[in-house]
Amino acid sequence: DLLREFLGAPDDQIDCPTEAQRELFGPTRRRVPEMLDLKNPVLLGPVQNQEHHMNGVVARRDNFNEPILGFLEQCYDEFAQLTGRRYGLIQEYRTEDADTVFVSLGCAAENVEAACDYLREQRGAKVGSIHINVIRPFPEAAVINALRGKKNVIVLERTDEGMSGDNPLGRDIRTTLSKGQEASRYGGTLPSITLDQTPRIFRGSYGLGSRDFRPEHTLGAYEFAVGGTVRKDGKSAADGETYFTLG
């Protein structure tokens, strides 16, 4: 009943929320548009010339992609009203006074949060965690606001793209902070962050080949970032190294 109330029925008629949708569907549309009508079996887009394909890609970005984050935030608010459980584009854990913040996806965040509790209680370390709930579109404004003024950010990912400059999430974090620096110089819609407010980015890979990811791995990541340990090749954060593998 809760899911039915929150999601509605596929054939409900709802108001179109954007001008682009109103132009496409009219003032209202089916909650889940029918992609195939057996009574009118037509197909759109299997073959397009270069001009029309490019126009479609640009129109999709401007008219349909950009409003998505706002829709998601509205959905999180409605879900919180129904259940009392509030999610968001990102979830912050003990980040208010943290100088080192972990960033992760999925169930890894639970291990990271447990390690943050241990580091605070046993070592007095000011650490926190950010759990990214939405990866596309990437929540750039929320990430900039959450990381502004931190000393270190440790991005943990269950992958290793060895021939790329960064793994995917680390690349998104680095790009986001760079765009925030541009906003501080040139303005724009994103929140601004100065170079002095930008944390140093550390990047770690864990759990490759389904190897276990344990809280002690998070402790090791923290020790590397603050200069308390070195990699097996002897290199450390003091040498300018920011990548490591856990486990």
What is each residue range found by the language model?
Residues 1-91:
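Conformationally flexible catalytic loops at phosphate/diphosphate-handling active centers
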Residues 2-12, 113-115, 140-142, 164-168, ...:
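Short acidic, glycine/serine/threonine-rich loops at helix termini
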Residues 6, 13-17, 92-97, 145-147, ...:
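Solvent-exposed alpha-helices and their adjacent loops that cap or buttress functional pockets
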Residues 74, 78, 82, 114-129:
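Short helix-loop-beta junction
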Residues 154-247:
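Peripheral docking tails and interdomain loops at the edges
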Residues 130-136, 203-207:
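Short beta->alpha junction loops
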Residues 89, 96-125, 138-145:
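Redox- and metal-dependent alpha/beta enzyme cores, enriched for Fe-S-associated oxidoreductases
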